């Protein structure tokens, strides 16, 4: 019983950390592509491919693109950079996406609901609900730097919540 609780707590924290790391990497990719406004589309695509290589997700991305083109023809004309961002942020089939990481963190927290503080559970649950609202209709793409800052900030809240003096 104790090892099961410890396991869920470990993975809850690990998935929150994974979401933060993904947000940092994607934010750097976004900033570098914005700073180099004169870059060609092929250079932006190479930068997006580098994100996939770092994450070891090239085959998963290619499979996702094949599936997307069958189910949603409007994504065929999407720039590779936007497709990579969407894949890394909101694809529920990508176990490394921010969506999947925060979903898994919430599920692990829910499994040990009695072992964590009410405040921590509420923070994780509200984070999940707000994430769903931001991902709806790709609203997060309207202000990506703010979205990535939000994810990074949330990971700090999760780290500091258990140590906060009451």
What is each residue range found by the language model?
Residues 1-156, 160, 164:
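Alpha-helical transmembrane segments and their helix-helix packing motifs
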């Amino acid at each position: 019983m104790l090892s099961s609780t410890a396991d869920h707590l470990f993975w809850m924290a690990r998935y929150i950390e994974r979401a933060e790391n993904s947000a940092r990497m994607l934010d750097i990719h976004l900033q570098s592509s914005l700073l180099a406004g004169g870059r060609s589309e092929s250079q932006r695509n190479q930068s997006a491919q580098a994100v996939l290589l770092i994450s070891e997700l090239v085959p998963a991305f290619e499979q996702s693109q094949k599936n997307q083109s069958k189910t949603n023809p409007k994504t065929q004309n999407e720039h590779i950079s936007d497709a990579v961002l969407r894949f890394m942020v909101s694809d529920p089939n990508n176990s490394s996406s921010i969506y999947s990481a925060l979903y898994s963190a919430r599920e692990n927290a829910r499994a040990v609901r009695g072992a964590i503080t009410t405040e921590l559970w509420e923070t994780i649950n509200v984070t999940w609900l707000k994430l769903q609202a931001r991902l709806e209709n790709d609203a997060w793409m309207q202000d990506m730097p703010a979205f990535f800052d939000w994810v990074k900030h949330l990971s700090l809240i999760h780290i500091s919540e258990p140590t906060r003096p009451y």
